[in-house]
Amino acid sequence: MIRIALTGAIGSGKSFISNLFGFPVFDADKSVANIYKKNKKIYLKLKNKLPKYFHKFPISKKELIRAILENKKNIKIISSIIHPAVRKDLKNFLRKYKKSKAVVLDIPLYLENKLNKKKDI
């Protein structure tokens, strides 16, 4: 299977372009949103590490923004909890579409998270 990775800033057209290929698309932003809405284990980990900011499930963007704005170091803590869950979603996606000719990986932080060693294009 060919893996086509798209990365870029917010509003750069990744989602639009990824759908033009006609292959299954892994959208990391949707994965993250789904994790915040449905993954109680992630909520509990965040609440354990940052109890000042996380008070109810599902996780709200307001709580996330407050945690990040009040202390920039919190982004590393949040990322260390969220990114493994997104990687798990990505692995499940790749397993599901392993017989597909190609897949598109719409991942804004693709290079920053050093996932670029696992793509074809």
Could you tell me what each predicted segment is?
Residues 17-18:
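Post-Walker A alpha-helix
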